[in-house]
Amino acid sequence: MDNYTYSELLKSLQNKCDNIALIIKPEKIKQELERIEKEQEDPNFWQDVLKARDTNKEKVRLNRLLETYQKTKNSLDESVELFELAQNDNDETTLSLLYEEAPTLEHSVQKVEIEIMLSGENDASNAIITIQPGAGGTESQDWASILYRMYLRWAERRGFKSEILDYQDGEEAGIKGVAFIIKGENAYGYLKNENGVHRLVRISPFDANAKRHTSFASVQISPELDDDIDIEIDEKDVRYDYYRASGAGGQHVNKTESAVRITHFPTGIVVQCQNDRSQHKNKASALKMLKSKLYELELEKQQSSAKNEEKSEIGWGHQIRSYVLAPYQQVKDARSNIAYSNVEAILDGDIDAILEGVLIAKA
């Protein structure tokens, strides 16, 4: 990097920071935080528990956004000042240090941009994830289990919690399907763009001839809805099936028909849960999954209508990302059009760069 390149980078980052300020309006955030603090001082604040909870959530979000913005702006202003002084004094040591820190400065501005992008209605929610293997038997079932582990490892890296709702072992390896919740700040906001088909190309560990195989798995993401969001489901539109649990989460198998499957006829959505020994609890969890999927479906329809587009199909034709392990190693996302070479780390849950790249591409 040279003086001109760094100077242009600073101009670009300053422009982005100015645009961010126009969007988030820091002074208005400060005023809103003052208003919330006064509201919290009211002795009657906790009488409406749901409202109080939402207010606290908003306070945390605004504080985090303001703190991230101010920290980034201060770092940028300091870098601009140091750069001018170093240029005037021909201070090569300081210039070299600034060049080295440029990627960190650039990433900090990007972090504020991501914070803004995660301010949607459901972005702060927990995420319900369903993974289904495509055609191909053991190959696809194994690929589905690899994706499942990838998301669990991502959650662990962030300190998020996870909870299995439904898990079906594959016949030889992998899984026939899994549904689980990732619980953490902005879990849905980060993962919402994972909806679609994930493609794997590799030398099959199940093929004695060591041939290259292509496998597919479908990932569906929906927000875990708060209890105060009411989604009405007509009983005549659904069918409940009860069966004996099997696989992980259902080690008490073949004793009681505690597992629950719900089919929603108007949409064709099928959800199932076998995580708990209690049929009642499994039914409640399955209903929560169904309501979340119906809510997500309605949001997609509204967004498509607003853009005057047809609803994008989340099916086997909607491929969002390819993971190639042979003959070369590369993960490429179809939305951001960015390719990544750290395939092993990605499959171990290091997917922040991919998720953020898609958020920025779709902004």
From Swiss-Prot:
One MF term in the entry's GO annotations: translation release factor activity, codon specific
Query: Where is the major localization of this protein?
Result: cytoplasm
A Pfam family in this protein?
RF-1
Location of this chain's protein in the cell: Cytoplasm
Please provide, in alphabetical order, the Gene Ontology terms of the cellular component aspect for this entry.
cytoplasm
Instruction: Say if the entry is tagged with keyword Signal.
Output: no
Which SMART domains does this UniProt record tie to the protein? PCRF
Q: What does this protein do?
A: Peptide chain release factor 2 directs the termination of translation in response to the peptide chain termination codons UGA and UAA.
Q: What is this protein called?
A: Peptide chain release factor 2
Annotated organism of origin: Helicobacter pylori (strain G27)
